From Swiss-Prot:
Homotrimer of disulfide-linked HEF1-HEF2. The gene is HE. One of its GO terms (cellular component) is virion membrane. GO terms for molecular function: host cell surface receptor binding; sialate 4-O-acetylesterase activity; sialate 9-O-acetylesterase activity. It is found in: Virion membrane; Host cell membrane. This is Hemagglutinin-esterase-fusion glycoprotein.
Length: 642
């Protein structure tokens, strides 16, 4: 009788790469990185479509006769905007004669501002000031700052006030023979005796606690006053020094100018200019005192509920060719902590006309149609990978990827897999399966004559004396690795929290240290991924070994007395007693009875909100659905034949 030895053969050559894991190793024909690097998309986006609002002008106004050609946003996004063609927040605050006066108001955790161009050098608004850019800069900066701390905001276009009897509303030639709606100009007639200057003005205004349905915890008020170059310019009529001062209810000065105690500019001009400072005032009653002849009275404000911290995005608002723009919006956002600025790289070129419907701006704002996982000064990301090639510039919010080099991301085995600790087998693409018995048999059986001396390859066994790793030792190993991961996270969190405490009140320090902190977070995450990779490799290896043990048991049971298992994974068969069809029955049963495969593990990593720019106390914030408890062998289902 001719006896032959049939074994499960190790099929590893130079094309395989070795992957070491906790509890077992693998050879693989391919490998892939656990995550690919993502690249942010330029422009604006939002984290949640249900919690944002926008303020705009004709470029976002659905009622514009040229819409949608006039728009820089989609029709869907335009519905989120509070817009009117020709409008701007500053125009509504001051109300220059002949300009659009729109009631801007709305609520949202994330506020996007795409307006401002309608008050620019091109509009040539005068009213005692040739250049309003500095005032616009301070106004926009104050709006962004307060909006980032509020859920709701609203223009208050009519403050309650009390005006002295001797003062009447005035006009100015350099203001289209009219004047601003805010502040309003009140004057005293001193004719026919011009040397009589009139009486000091005393007026009152009230900032409400509520305007319509909008709660007001803080108001943005323009404190405006005239600036005279010398006492003589104001004092042509012998009227003393100029002053215009705002007091709170306790008599404390909160704004204005008093040339009785402050010097004049010393310049040689004959015409005063008007200055407006932006004050943040609580609701209440305020008084205004001014020198005779002129009174500038606050009659409007923007009110904010100050209920929650939120996100602010400011979009560069400039004209197309032929019109002069300013860059107050850009400068205001860049000088406001937490404000994200969207800027063009090319001149504005409109579709509807030179100033409406720019393709580059449409691309930059197209992200507003979607929800992003991360928004930052560098752009927005909606992919789930935790890594990006370059550091994302702050401010940034959401689940933002960390900067990492591609070569630093751990690789996991792919393609054909063969465990090295006591067995050999194959598996197709682990992204669709981990292992299955039908993968283990096809192409792996070979027949060898006993005399050739080809021995079997050790197969993992349930017994301590077997060639594999026991469940008990693997469980202990995984438990230790799990504890190590928790220690790594805890120590990293503690270090970052200490940094947070040091820099929580210093925005510049935050910016200086952010890169260093992010590098630490990235290194810690990469360290965790290395541990998780090793767990996965060991888990798959041990699982394959266990599955082969089950396969060997099934083969032995099918063979009965026809084959004798002489070593783990090897059997002696009498070729005269068990012919080819008999051997096929014993060793190739999977061809007629395929076994279901095991579902793949979920290896997704999820970065939580950035702790430095979202006001969060989180440190190294990563979560993963890979439960360490689920990685131990006792928690893994092994394919078994019936």
């Amino acid at each position: 009788a001719e006896k032959i030895k049939i074994c499960l053969q190790k099929q590893v050559n130079s094309s395989f790469s070795l992957h070491n894991g906790f509890g077992g190793n693998l050879y693989a024909t391919e490998e892939k990185r656990m995550f690919e690097l993502v690249k942010p998309k330029a422009g604006a986006s939002v984290l949640n479509q249900s919690t944002w609002i926008c303020f705009g002008d004709s470029r976002t106004d659905q009622s514009n006769s040229a819409f949608p050609r006039s728009a820089d946003v989609s029709a869907k996004t335009a519905e989120k905007f509070r817009s009117l063609s020709g409008g701007s927040l500053m125009l509504s605050m001051f109300g220059p004669p002949g300009k659009v006066d729109y009631l801007y108001q709305g609520c949202g955790k994330h506020k996007v501002f795409y307006e401002g161009v309608n008050w620019s050098p091109h509009t040539a608004i005068d009213c005692y000031r040739k250049n309003w850019t500095d005032i616009k800069l301070n106004f926009q900066k104050s709006i962004y700052e307060l909006a980032s701390q509020s859920h709701c905001m609203s223009l208050v276009n009519a403050l309650d006030k009390t005006i002295p009897l001797q003062a009447t509303k005035g006009v100015a030639k350099n203001c289209n023979n009219s004047f601003l709606k805010n502040p309003a100009l009140y004057t005293q007639e001193v004719k026919p005796l011009e040397q009589i200057c009139g009486e000091e003005n005393l007026a009152f205004f009230t900032l409400p606690t509520q305007f319509g349905t909008y709660e007001c915890k803080l108001h943005l008020v323009a404190s405006c006053y005239f600036i005279y170059d010398s006492k003589e310019v104001y004092n042509k009529r012998g009227c003393g020094n100029y002053f215009q001062v705002i007091y709170d209810s306790s008599g404390k000065v909160v704004g204005g100018l008093d040339n009785r105690v402050s010097p004049y500019t010393g310049n040689s001009g004959d015409t005063p200019t008007m200055q407006c400072d932006m004050l943040q005032l609580k609701p209440g009653r305020y008084s205004v005192r001014s020198s005779p002849r002129f009174l500038l009275m606050p009659e409007r404000s923007y009110c904010f509920d100050m209920k929650e911290k939120g996100l602010v995005t400011a979009v560069q608002s400039i004209w197309g060719k032929g019109r002069k723009s300013d860059y107050a919006v850009d400068q205001a956002c860049l000088s406001t902590p937490g404000c994200m600025l969207i800027q063009k790289q090319k001149p504005y070129i409109g579709e509807a006309d030179d100033h409406h419907g720019d393709q580059e701006m449409r691309e930059l704002l197209s992200g507003l149609d979607y929800e992003a996982r991360c928004i930052s000064q560098s752009g927005w990301v909606n992919e789930t990978s935790p890594f990006t090639e370059e550091y994302l510039l702050p401010p940034k919010f959401g689940r933002c990827p960390l900067a990492a080099k591609e070569e630093s991301i751990p690789k996991i085995p792919d393609g054909l897999l063969i465990p090295t600790s006591g067995t050999d087998t194959t598996v197709t693409k682990p992204k669709s399966r981990i292992f299955g018995i039908d993968d283990l048999i096809i192409g792996l059986l070979f027949v060898a004559i006993v005399e050739a001396g080809i021995g079997g390859y050790l197969l993992g066994s349930r017994k301590e004396s077997g060639g594999g790793v026991t469940k008990e030792s693997a469980e202990k190993g995984f438990e230790k690795i799990g504890n190590d991961i928790q220690i790594l996270r805890s120590s990293t969190n503690i270090a970052i929290e200490k940094l947070n405490d040091r820099i929580s009140h210093d925005e510049q320090a935050i910016r200086d240290l952010t890169l260093e902190i992010e590098n630490a977070r990235s290194e810690a995450l990469l360290g965790e991924l290395g541990i998780i990779r090793a767990l996965l490799v060991g888990n798959i290896s041990i699982g394959l070994q266990e599955s082969l043990w089950e396969l060997a048991s099934e083969i032995t049971n099918r063979a009965g007395d026809l084959a004798v298992e002489v070593s783990p994974g090897c059997w002696i068969i009498d070729n005269n007693i068990c012919d080819q069809s008999c051997q096929n029955f014993i060793f190739k049963f999977n061809e007629t009875a395929p076994v279901p495969t095991i579902p793949p593990l979920d290896t997704k990593i999820d970065l939580q909100s950035d702790p430095f720019y979202w006001g969060s106390s989180l440190g190294l914030a990563i979560t993963t659905p890979i439960s360490l408890a689920a990685l131990v062998i006792s928690g893994i289902a092994i394919c078994r034949t019936k």
